[in-house]
């Protein structure tokens, strides 16, 4: 009698337990959806057991991070341990001076980790340009996924305690849960301790029918944005343009920039939708992270709608700390520029990110100046004339796209080449041929922008429709969406863009 071979089974188990840099565990992968289904079955058993639930979620979160960054899950544990004890010290300290030194220690530890892993080679490159190539050797430093997100999240906890807005947690596991919670661990939204921590020890954990339905809707829309729109237009159009801009006409270069604007929105907001949706299925609420940003009529409005958790973090912990708008107009404009420069640097250690931040900082400062000197310029939303709002949306979108060109291009030479093609080799006569040649990509780009520009009430109607549908119908919709994803997805899993930050 021959026993069935089990090598294949154990190979798969070993693969599940092994870190592979080329195969991170991401929300849009079939593996994650399979593991999450099993995770939810066990999670439901801990509905009335807060401590067991906390430990179980922490273990899964650390496994999730291990599959993305390997041994560097220990860095996450170190960050949680460090700020847990520093926060207790800040709260216990009797003098303002001692509290200040402790919060500075927290900031130094967090920014020190970020600086080492993210900016060491950038600083070495600057030194080599100043003192000659070979002055310093580049280091082989691994960048842990999502380090910028959990560092900011951890700093907000100690700063809030220093400001007297929060009391420190008594249980280290609660803080590790807050910092490592897997739905938002690697790409946000950047959580706020005062909003999230009160939810940790719910007993019993409550997932209402509305929460469940909304969670399903957000997961499905996130999958659609990421796997069907973002990945497809990236692989089949946008990447080709940015890789070899001289091979394409100015129209194609412009379409590539517009395509990237949609790609990065669908990629990042798709992740945020899935993160918020998964959290809802677990009984936790996160605030909205995107609010149709390309409907913005001003750059200020854009930053109220784009990556809301980062823009509010920069406002509350950097811009206001610099003085905000309390120290005169010139200082206000300078604070905006500094905040956005550092926001650009937060995204990555490269000149292109600094220039991207400088562009947005200068635009925000100029818009604030414009509002100060032009009567009626503060009008927003429905108070604007329709033609004024339409013109504002067109101008703001193209300004943002100029920023995306710098953000996406691998070098400033690529920026120059694409702008040259747009202004000197547009080749409008080729537009019909280009559109027919990339029919699938252009159809998705058009559909994506049309869906994005639909009235908010249409989105709310769709959400209510899905969230109030019978469970069987929700399962059918989920299965249909997964089938569609399988039909259009590339052979290789495409990581989320913001994983690199």
Regions found by a protein language model. Name each.
Residues 2-451, 455-500:
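Membrane-embedded transmembrane alpha-helical bundles that form the catalytic cores
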């Amino acid at each position: 009698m021959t026993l069935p071979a089990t090598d294949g089974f154990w190979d798969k188990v070993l693969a599940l337990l092994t870190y592979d840099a080329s195969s991170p565990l991401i929300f849009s992968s079939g593996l994650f959806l399979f593991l999450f289904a099993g995770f939810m079955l066990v999670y439901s058993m801990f509905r009335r057991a807060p401590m067991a639930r906390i430990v179980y979620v922490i273990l899964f979160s650390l496994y999730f991070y291990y599959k993305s960054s390997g041994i560097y899950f220990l860095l996450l544990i170190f960050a949680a341990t460090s700020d847990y004890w520093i926060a207790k010290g800040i709260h216990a300290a009797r003098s303002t001076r001692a509290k200040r030194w402790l919060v500075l220690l927290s900031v130094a530890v967090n920014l020190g980790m970020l600086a080492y892993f993210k900016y060491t080679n950038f600083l070495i490159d600057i030194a080599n340009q100043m003192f000659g190539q070979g002055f310093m050797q580049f280091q082989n430093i691994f960048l842990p996924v999502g380090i910028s997100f959990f560092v900011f999240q951890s700093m907000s906890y100690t700063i809030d305690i220093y400001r007297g807005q929060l009391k420190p947690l008594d249980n280290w596991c609660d803080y590790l849960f807050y910092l490592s919670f897997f739905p938002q661990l690697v790409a946000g939204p950047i959580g706020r301790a005062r909003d999230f921590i009160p939810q940790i020890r719910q007993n019993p954990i409550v997932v209402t029918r509305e929460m469940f339905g909304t969670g399903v809707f957000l997961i499905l829309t996130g999958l659609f944005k990421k796997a069907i729109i973002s990945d497809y237009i990236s692989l089949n159009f946008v990447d080709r343009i940015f890789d070899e801009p001289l091979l394409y006409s100015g129209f194609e270069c412009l379409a590539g920039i517009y395509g990237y604007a949609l790609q990065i929105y669908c990629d990042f907001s798709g992740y945020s939708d899935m993160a918020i949706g998964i959290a809802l299925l677990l009984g936790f609420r996160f605030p909205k992270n995107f609010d149709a940003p390309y409907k913005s009529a001003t750059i200020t409005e854009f930053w109220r709608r784009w990556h809301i958790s980062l823009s509010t973090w920069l406002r509350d912990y950097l811009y206001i700390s610099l003085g905000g708008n309390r120290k005169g107009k010139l200082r206000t404009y300078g604070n905006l520029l500094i905040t956005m420069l550092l926001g650009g640097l937060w995204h990555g250690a490269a000149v292109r990110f600094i220039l991207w931040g400088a562009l947005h900082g200068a635009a925000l400062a100029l818009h604030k100046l414009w509002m100060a000197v032009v009567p009626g310029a503060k009008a927003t939303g429905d108070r604007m004339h329709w033609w004024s709002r339409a013109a504002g949306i067109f101008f703001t979108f193209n300004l943002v796209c100029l920023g995306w060109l710098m953000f996406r291009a691998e070098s400033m030479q690529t920026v120059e080449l694409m702008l040259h093609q747009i202004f000197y080799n547009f080749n409008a006569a080729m537009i019909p041929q280009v559109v027919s040649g990339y029919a699938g990509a252009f159809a998705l780009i058009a559909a994506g922008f049309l869906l994005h520009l639909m009235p908010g009430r249409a989105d709310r109607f769709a959400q209510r429709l899905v969230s109030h549908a019978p469970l069987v119908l929700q399962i059918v919709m989920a299965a249909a969406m997964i089938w569609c994803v399988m039909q259009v997805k590339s052979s290789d899993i495409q990581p989320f863009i913001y994983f690199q930050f």
